[in-house]
Amino acid sequence: MAKKYWIETYGCQMNVAESDALELELEKSGWEHAQSPEEAHAVLLHTCSVRQTAEDRIWGRLGFYKHLKGQHDGERQKMRIVVTGCMAERLGEQITDTYPSVDLVVGNFAKQHIAEELERIVPSGEGRARLEENDSFEFSRFHSREGAHHAYVPIMHG
């Protein structure tokens, strides 16, 4: 059975472009896009900290995923919850303190390691890592959604 991921993106067009690049990286590593969060082995929340309403929505979604993660039975691996983006960068420790169900918090400059970290924590059941690195997330190529007539192209970061 293939490992499946689900990505939720909040905020700016930069996050949309980076989520598209994250999808490519995950698919290169053998992951498949889930049809719903309920069937995902890993859920990634690509977060924004610009507006309080975005943060409030993300806190709510973390509660939803905590509950969903607790519903998985022994027949299926537990869902892994990953938080990345500006909110992860700014509030990483608060996120893991408030929601111990979060398995991985990834700052803005370590996103290129998400696929390899998921390879480690999904099969082993290990979790609770925080990745920080002073490197830019590099896009291997730009990804446009199937059937889309446009794609976001980042021109700066931060």
Predicted regions and their residues:
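Proteins enriched for Cys/Gly/acidic motifs involved in redox and nucleic-acid/cofactor modification
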Residues: 1-158
